[in-house]
Regions:
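Conserved alpha-helix/loop element of class I SAM-dependent methyltransferases that forms part
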Residues: 1-10
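Class I SAM-dependent methyltransferase SAM/SAH-binding core
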Residues: 14-58
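A short glycine-rich, Lys/Arg-flanked "PGG" loop and its adjoining helix->strand segment in the class I
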Residues: 84-96
């Protein structure tokens, strides 16, 4: 799948699961605080933004700390309970009027066969080829599940793009 990213966010950004390729950090640079719960993923990410080891389900930030919160293909690595908690925490640290943006895949099964998907991302004159994958039970997800969790936390959807294998969701607090 091919995805082109443009700068669409203004202000501070919390990128949840921002290790690895660090796409949001590379696009928005110093505006980003990237968190990941795996130190090796943070170490792998480019040094273009602030990086912190942290659990998305228990964010160590004050209420309404960020103008934007992003999940760039990171919720797929969590079980349903953690997805719900992470989205609740995202809403807590998001400023009133702030935006929550989610890019992710529809996953109907990741066991016994792993879920794997290739992604080509174009942004700021760069092209990154990567593959995301997960194996296990309880990681199934679709846009409707995430929409429900966000709406339960008083976020209003303003964008829903469908891709061949996934989706992009946008919410305002």
């Amino acid at each position: 799948m091919k995805l082109t990213l443009e700068k669409e966010l203004c202000g501070s950004i919390l990128d949840i699961g921002g290790g690895g390729e660090g796409i949001i950090g590379r696009l928005y640079k110093s505006a980003v605080t990237a968190i990941d719960n795996v130190q090796e993923e943070l170490d792998e990410a480019p040094d273009c933004c602030k990086k912190l080891l942290m659990d998305a389900a228990e964010l160590d930030f004050d209420n309404e700390s960020f103008d934007n919160v992003t999940f760039f293909y990171s919720l797929m690595y969590t079980d349903t309970e953690t997805k719900e908690k992470a989205l609740k925490e995202a809403g807590r640290v998001l400023k009133k009027g702030g935006r929550l943006i989610i890019w992710d895949y529809v996953i109907t099964s990741a066991y016994p066969k792993a879920f794997l998907a290739e992604l080509e991302i174009e942004f700021s004159g760069e092209t990154v080829h990567t593959e995301y994958g997960i194996i296990g039970t309880g990681v199934e997800q679709d846009a409707e599940m995430l929409i429900k969790f966000c709406e339960e936390n008083k976020m209003k959807m303003f964008e829903h793009e469908k891709y061949a294998e996934g989706f992009k969701l946008g919410f305002i607090k």
